[in-house]
Swiss-Prot record:
Binding site for [4Fe-4S] cluster 3: C67, C70, C75, C109
Keyword Iron-sulfur attached: yes
PANTHER family for the chain: ANAEROBIC DIMETHYL SULFOXIDE REDUCTASE CHAIN B-RELATED, PROTEIN NRFC
High-level lineage: Bacteria, Pseudomonadati, Pseudomonadota, Gammaproteobacteria, Pasteurellales
Cofactor binding remark: Binds 4 [4Fe-4S] clusters.
Keyword Membrane listed: no
PROSITE patterns: 4FE4S_FER_1 (PS00198), 4FE4S_FER_2 (PS51379)
Cofactors that this protein relies on: [4Fe-4S] cluster
Name of this protein: Anaerobic dimethyl sulfoxide reductase chain B
Residues making up the signal peptide according to the UniProt record: none
UniProt keywords, alphabetically: 4Fe-4S, Electron transport, Iron, Iron-sulfur, Metal-binding, Repeat, Transport
Cited function: Electron transfer subunit of the terminal reductase during anaerobic growth on various sulfoxide and N-oxide compounds.
Domain 4Fe-4S ferredoxin-type: 4-32, 57-89, 90-119
Gene this chain is encoded by: dmsB
Amino acid sequence: MEQYGFYFDSERCTGCKTCELACKDYKDLGTEVNFRRIYEYTGGQWNQQADGCWHQNIFAYYMSISCNHCADPACTKVCPTGAMHKNADGFVIVNEEICIGCRYCHMACPYDAPQYDAQKGHMTKCDGCYSRVKSGQKPICVDACPLRALDFAPIDELRTKYGTQASIAPLPPTDITQPNLVVKPNKYARLSGDTSGFLGNPREV
């Protein structure tokens, strides 16, 4: 089994959300379901110095995240029907025909990848554009990015090319589920577990 994964360049990303919208359009998703989400992590403050001048250490950067098709997915472990599973090609997918919509997978996933579709009455999620990949194409989010901040390939190739870093705030540490994700950190990036910043767009994600 050749495991695929995503690469994300946080230095290039401007938070335009083209990847998110391309996914919604391609998958015909409703307003309440987002398979790919853009997180804005921001922080810092202004401090007045003794001479009256102001000094700032404000920072902000974006993270584009979908399902990471983890090596040790938490979502599959809690699914009572086996609907959420990792297929032979390494993609974590949901069998919508047997999913009962209990949302345990959503509660277990540290990346909020499984999404409940109220119209369908069961869970849905990013499938890595499995059909496109099988035909030799990239996922729609990767092809849509105008800054080429996303890539998708066998994870061993991505790690050889870009490194292994993926524990970037506001994401959780990688040892929880071993995500098949590589991140090129923004110059302002903080490591997972950082408390100096906060999520700047909580209602969007």
